[in-house]
Amino acid sequence: DHRDLHSFPTRRSSDLMTCVLALQGGKPQAGWAMQHKLDLNYSPGHARDFEPAGYAATATAEMCRNLMRFYRWTGDTKYLARIPDAFEFLESIRYNDAQMKQLGKSVKPGQILCPTFVEVGTNRPLYLHNDPDHYWVDYDYHGLITHYSSTRAIDLQSLKDEYQHLLSLSKEDFSAETALAIAQAASSAL
């Protein structure tokens, strides 16, 4: 039936949006991993050899952006509901000024510096190492692999600003923005 073919992308999008909601960790680790297991809790799993089973700062920031897109497309507030939990999680894993100095890192205004991965259950930073034979993960920030950063700058302020903007929209403004978002998505797909 041709109607099924036309509804397939919509069903697939709906499945993806539901999956993003389901994969978010519970408080206080309300983030996302690079990969999740298919266990009862969709817990973080190992991805590539050097990507440990842990919550990931960049995946968390990107999923927040996706949830805000889903809200723009659907108008369903369930996509905004747990974003503040993710913001709290990112704040909880951020490096303070002394830690950034120790790591020799700095960030731009509005950004925070976070470990790329944190341990499930503890939020301890996980650092990536290798020798010619294998990769390993531990808590020591010395002697890190050079082809994959163990820290990430997250523009948390811009995420918070976008979130507040979406909350502040009137129904009329929201309708106009939703139509614009759909038109932009359609034109970029061409």
Where are these regions (language model features)?
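Compositionally biased amphipathic helical and low-complexity segments enriched in hydrophobic
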Residues: 6, 39-41, 157
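Intrinsically disordered, low-complexity N-terminal regions enriched in serine/proline/glycine
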Residues: 3-5, 31, 78, 126
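Terminal, non-catalytic domain-edge segments
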Residues: 15, 43-51, 58-190
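Positively charged
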Residues: 19-35, 98-102
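Intrinsic, low-complexity N-terminal interaction/targeting segments
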Residues: 28-51
